[in-house]
Amino acid sequence: RLGISSYTYTWAIGVPGSSPSNPLRVCGLLEKAISNGITVVQIADNLPLENLSEEETDLLRDFADAKGISLEIGGRGLIPGHVMKCLKTAEAIGSPILRMVIDTNNYEPEVPEIIAIIQELETEFRSRKIRMAIENHDRLKAREFENIIQSVGSEWVGICLDSVNSMGAGEGFETVSDILLPYTINLHIKDFTIRRVSHKMGIIIEGAPAGKGLLNIRDILSRASETGICKSAILELWTPPEKSIEETIIKEEKWAEESIQYLKSLKL
């Protein structure tokens, strides 16, 4: 199923050092899904839900249910107490997965510690029938993520496969997808372009609307569907900024609409 994310509209929500005057909030994100005919919304760590009150959480779930929207939750920081807080929120809103980015700005556990933490938490996920989806995110190589998944050895722990992040670890998506697709339970569709800088000594990797970049989206969706375990494909955007935050948000909105229409044309 095709979905959008709080990282589809990153600028509209706000990034450190650049906050819009009227930032997008959860209800606004759901309204964008409704207006675009999207039935899955992944609400990630840039729009955290774990601090909502029980009443606010219930209202969110009821609103989403009434509109026919399935919610997914994303967290950042594989710290047991924080993961449990996010997991309880995922349970409360009916999310089938908890997408987790391992690192934070000041927390980068080594692989053995990551494995130990996930093994400790696995029974909590299993008892709630919620899957932990570990996102490939910059620092670790694909084989290290594979080692984590194989070492834990649980159907309740898999991969959230992002199409661009592993370039931060020096790996292209073909390599990463070949290794991690068998474990992928959630897919981030993030198209991209690569161009040389003007002096030719270096390259720049930037986002692009889905279908306008280098990512072979049709192929990755076909391969993901063949595994039988990947249940949602979530659109994310890396929208290069314009001169003002207002212009950037307009561009981001246009890219989102273009991307959704393209992805719908693929008959997900």
Language model features: what each stretch is:
Residues 3-7, 99, 182-195, 234-237:
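Non-cysteine beta-strand/loop elements that form the S-adenosyl-L-methionine
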Residues 11-15, 106-108, 169, 241-246:
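A short acidic, helix-capping loop that chelates divalent metal ions and anchors anionic groups
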Residues 213-220, 227, 231-237, 241:
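H/E-rich (His + Asp/Glu) clusters that bind or coordinate divalent metals
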